[in-house]
Amino acid sequence: MPLKAELHCHIEGAAAPELVIRQAQKYGKDTAPYIQNGSFVWHDFTSFLAAYDFSAELFRTEEDYARLADHYLTSLARDGAIYSEVFTSPDHATKAGLSPKAYTDALGEGMLRAKAKTGIEGRMIVTGVRHVGVESIERAARFAARCGNPLVTGFGVAGDERVGEMEDYVRAFEIAREAGLGITIHAGELTGWETVQAALDHIRPSRIGHGVRAIENPDLVRRIADEGIVLECCPGSNIALKVFDSFADHPLPALQAAGCKVTLNSDDPPYFWTSLKREYDIAAEHFAMNEKALAAVTRTAIEAAFVDRKTKAALLARLNGAAR
């Protein structure tokens, strides 16, 4: 089993159905409309968001969030992952009645619990949400810059790509960049190549969340390759959300063949009936990646990770040791 690393997963979207059911029992909520036969059920983007929001609202206390992070990273480690970055949302903290700091520190505590048991390293990317608004995104950036938690190492923007313009988020990313945080932004998923180009022009990230619609513009693909931008690809998510009709249509192999740096990620794994392990299995089955190619994908992820040099070197040493 190849060692794995993940750069793109939303922590609220990583809550496994069995954990959500336990949380629902704790708070007296009925999961029947959203979980059936041990799986999340939804039929379009609106119903997906409804299921997601229902589950997210079941995490309300610091211990709830610590349990969530511990549960997810421990499950990743069981599947061979040695590194995990998760997107966190101060907006979810506010909805839960927690301060962003209490929420973040609780998630960090869960990560440390998982590390103590399994050795997995975890980091957080504080994330603003497009459809919540520019002011909220800038608040998230200011929080990320000053929160003081050593596991917060990145800043990003997610949410509905159809809302807002990249120019709107320049100040937020300036705040994050000045604080030394790694920069990533969702683009080129539900919208076309234009959002990827706008992100490169205005935000100047080192990584793009998804970015797969760049395949629609050969000049943009060349630019991504030339600039060494790392794509956080999520094939299982893309098929579940009908960004592409099938894995045979997915552009990851073409992007890689064009010289783009690609990684494998699960996005919101239980909602898309996937996992990081399954993403690696998909790459093996549908993209003809052998063990060496999969190890190279993991290496790309670790090299692009928002983590200090010492930890990165240790992760690469683990990967090199496993490859011998």
UniProtKB/Swiss-Prot annotation:
Cofactor note: Binds 1 zinc ion per subunit.
GO BP: adenine catabolic process; hypoxanthine salvage; nucleotide metabolic process
Residues bound to substrate: D268
Chain residues that bind Zn(2+): H8, H10, H186, D267
Domain of life: Bacteria
Positions marked as site (Important for catalytic activity): H210
Coiled-coil region(s): none
Reactions that this protein is recorded to catalyse: adenine + H2O + H(+) = hypoxanthine + NH4(+)
Pfam families, sorted: A_deaminase (PF00962)
Record protein name field: Adenine deaminase
Organism field: Mesorhizobium japonicum (strain LMG 29417 / CECT 9101 / MAFF 303099) (Mesorhizobium loti (strain MAFF 303099))
